[in-house]
Design a protein with these regions (language model features):
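Helix-to-loop junction immediately C-terminal to a conserved catalytic motif
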Residues: 57
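A short, proline-enriched helix->beta-strand linker immediately N-terminal to the Walker B motif
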Residues: 155-159
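Short coil-to-helix segment of the ABC ATPase nucleotide-binding domain corresponding to the Q-loop/switch region
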Residues: 94-103
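The feature captures the beta-strand-to-loop junction immediately N-terminal to the Walker
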Residues: 42-44
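Conserved ABC ATPase "signature" region
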Residues: 112-132, 184
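Conserved ABC transporter NBD signature motif
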Residues: 65-76
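A short, flexible loop at the N-terminus of ABC-type nucleotide-binding domains that lies
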Residues: 2-6, 15-28
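Conserved ABC ATPase signature
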Residues: 136-140, 144
């Protein structure tokens, strides 16, 4: 595979062993991502969104095809790809500062202690957590924990920030504040982001492109929607924006109409095949 883009997924497929034989979770996933793009993956539960993210992260290895980042094939986890999960995954016995420091020590071995301290404080400031550097996870809210998790990921200076439903467990107001923070950080850093979400409004608000997945098994990319809304984006202004609502409608149409038709056709085809098989068996 030759690299033409920042991040490339080419003919990616993955099978998982089961007692009844291989289960094909993904098939023929092709995606080209440019440096600095914000990509959202959306689809129904079980469509393979997290599997795609895990393959990019190097946590799963594709059965077919592969992933290339800046000319290098991805086969295992690496610091150039930082992951933020729905669960913040902070170490409970370490302060916010120490949790970020742990990641920085693994990726910034050339920095002096003073430089390392400045870098940790800078990333905590990016997510508006400077006031809580000495707090343990148990002493801060769920939204604050997730902010620290994002700071920890950013402090690794990854080429790609991978986020698996990072705001899914938060209340609506906290989620909105974090979405605004992510937009600010993305504007400041210009980093590449791949995010999984179930939230249509979140996808349209944050993304440059929305990748819509078909339902599994053998899930793949159904459609890719370009979001041509100017940045910076204001959620209140967008609420009455016809183009915003058009994009929102397109995603909902794919998820709740087109997928239903696809499933209906597939079910009808399977029923016809089963019926034909039964006739053949009776004739035999």
């Amino acid at each position: 595979m030759t690299a033409k883009h920042h991040l490339e997924l080419t003919q990616v497929g993955i099978d998982f062993p089961t007692p009844k034989g291989p289960f094909t979770a993904l098939t023929d996933v092709n995606l080209r991502i440019n440096k600095g793009e914000f990509i959202s993956l959306i689809g129904h539960s079980g469509c393979g969104k997290s599997t795609v993210l895990n393959i990019i992260a190097g946590l799963h290895k594709a059965t077919k095809g592969g992933v290339i980042l800046d000319g290098q094939e991805v086969n295992e986890p690496g610091p150039e790809r930082a992951v933020v999960f729905q669960n913040h995954s902070l170490l409970p016995w370490l302060t916010a500062y120490k949790n970020v420091e742990l990641a920085v020590k693994q990726t910034s071995k050339g920095r002096s202690k003073a430089e390392m301290r400045d870098w940790i404080e800078h990333n905590l400031e990016l997510v508006h957590m400077s006031h809580a550097v000495d707090k343990l996870p148990a002493e801060i809210s769920g939204g604050m924990k997730q902010r620290v998790g994002i700071a920890r990921a950013l402090a690794m200076e990854p080429k790609v920030l991978l986020m698996d439903e990072p705001f899914g467990a938060l209340d609506a107001l906290t989620r909105a504040h974090l979405q605004d923070s992510i937009m600010e950080i993305h504007a400041d850093l210009g980093n590449t982001v791949v995010m999984i979400t179930h939230d249509v409004d979140e996808a349209v608000l944050l993304s440059d492109r929305i990748v819509m997945m078909t339902n599994g098994p053998s899930a793949t990319i159904g459609e890719v929607l370009n979001i041509e809304l100017p940045r910076p984006r204001d959620r209140l202004a967008l609420a009455d924006n016809p183009q915003y609502n058009h994009y929102r409608h397109d995603v909902l149409t794919f998820l709740y109409e087109k997928q239903r038709k696809v499933e209906s056709v597939a079910a009808h085809r399977k029923k016809s095949q089963d019926g034909a098989k039964g006739v053949q068996e009776n004739v035999a």
